[in-house]
């Protein structure tokens, strides 16, 4: 189960990827989430990955893959 903030970022990732065919940058995630630091986004992504919703590839930019659908998500 995702927290409210994690779910907000999850939905943003899904919509952004669908509209742009690429995942957003950290800066775009920061702006959407109104978070000032990269570490705030990093922590959200870390726990989303730990919970099994996304997979990240640290050596590549924008390399986030949604691997698990969120329950009750209509995006």
Task: Locate the predicted segments by residue.
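Helix-turn-helix DNA-binding helix
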Residues: 40-41
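Pre-recognition alpha-helix immediately N-terminal to the DNA-recognition helix
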Residues: 8-15
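Residues within the DNA-recognition helix of helix-turn-helix
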Residues: 44
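Short, cationic-aromatic polyanion-contact patches
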Residues: 3-6, 20, 25, 57-75
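Glycine-centered, phosphate/nucleic-acid-interacting loop/turn motifs that mediate DNA/RNA or nucleotide
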Residues: 52
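Basic amphipathic alpha-helical segments that dock to polyanions
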Residues: 47-48
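The alpha-helix within a helix-turn-helix
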Residues: 30
